[in-house]
């Protein structure tokens, strides 16, 4: 059931026209395959859970799982540093081998780290009263670390208002983004911008791990709140108008930071403080998350 309803939330942003024009044809190869994502990942959490309860698989202590999560993000940071060296052609001769070796390590760790992140977020949600009377969090926190899709945002030219959005494959180059934006402007007489995202509320959610442990916790909580909102009136009216979309995104952003920061403090002992925004937000500005 959850697979269908969460997919339906996003399909409003993914479906195309029955009579594709030049811009639709150009965008087509770059569209994110939401259905494929759901089929590939929907059962991952429950397969891992089943493996965990097998008698010969004992769950490591929480302290060890937290240390593994911190190591995972440290290794990810090392990979990014090496990739920058590779791009600048300033790295050592064995840089490819070093990247591959680190990547194998993080790939092996990833399922366990995802479970740790989900567990820590769930614990905070229970403390904050999101659980049922029997202590169950619904929907369960479920996330996969992956490259997050891009988003094509369409607006009228004479005022700022999101009238359409489409999820795109991650990793589209700046040159291709510019070509698509120019084509849409020329063919459809609307403004277009392609942006990157930190996560998407598929189920399980897509969460980018291009940042830190703290970032991943906040994004995971943000996307879970979208899942939870779906079963509340505020989420069921997400697509009614731009104001409702903004309300949903703002609530998920604020709540995601609070929940994520509390999970980060519980895991690391570090007290998190966030500086208040120095400028008032423009109510007509896009929120692309």
Task: Annotate each predicted stretch with a short phrase.
Residues 78-82, 87, 91-281:
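Acidic/His-rich structured neighborhood in mature extracellular/periplasmic domains
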Residues 32-37, 42, 50, 72-73, ...:
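Phenylalanine-focused residue identity feature
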Residues 1-3, 283-289:
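Pan-zinc metallopeptidase signature
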Residues 1-131:
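N-terminal low-structure segments adjacent to metalloprotease catalytic domains
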């Amino acid at each position: 059931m959850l697979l269908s309803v969460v997919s339906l939330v996003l399909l409003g942003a993914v479906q195309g026209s029955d009579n594709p024009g030049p811009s639709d044809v150009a965008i087509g190869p770059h569209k994110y395959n939401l259905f494929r994502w759901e089929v590939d990942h929907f059962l991952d959490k429950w397969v891992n859970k089943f493996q965990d309860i097998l008698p010969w698989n004992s769950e490591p202590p929480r302290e060890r799982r937290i240390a593994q999560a911190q190591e995972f993000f440290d290794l990810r940071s090392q990979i990014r540093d090496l990739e920058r060296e590779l791009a600048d052609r300033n790295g050592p001769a064995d840089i490819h081998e070093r990247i591959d070796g680190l990547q194998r390590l993080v790939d092996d760790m990833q399922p366990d780290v995802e479970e740790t992140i989900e567990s820590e977020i769930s614990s905070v949600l229970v403390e904050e009263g999101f659980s049922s009377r029997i202590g169950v969090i619904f929907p369960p926190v479920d996330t996969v670390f992956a490259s997050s899709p891009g988003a094509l945002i369409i607006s009228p030219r004479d005022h700022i208002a999101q009238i359409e959005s489409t999820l795109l494959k991650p990793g589209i180059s700046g040159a291709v983004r510019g070509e698509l934006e120019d084509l849409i402007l020329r063919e459809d007489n609307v403004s277009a911008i392609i942006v990157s995202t930190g996560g998407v509320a598929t189920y399980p959610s897509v969460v980018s791990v291009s940042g830190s442990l703290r970032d991943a916790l906040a994004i995971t909580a943000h996307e879970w709140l979208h899942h939870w909102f779906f079963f509340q009136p505020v989420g069921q009216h997400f697509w009614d108008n731009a104001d409702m979309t903004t309300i949903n995104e703002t609530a998920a952003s604020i709540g995601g930071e609070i929940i994520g920061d509390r999970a980060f403090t519980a895991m690391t002992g570090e007290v998190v403080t966030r500086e208040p925004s120095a400028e008032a937000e423009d109510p007509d500005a896009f929120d692309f998350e």
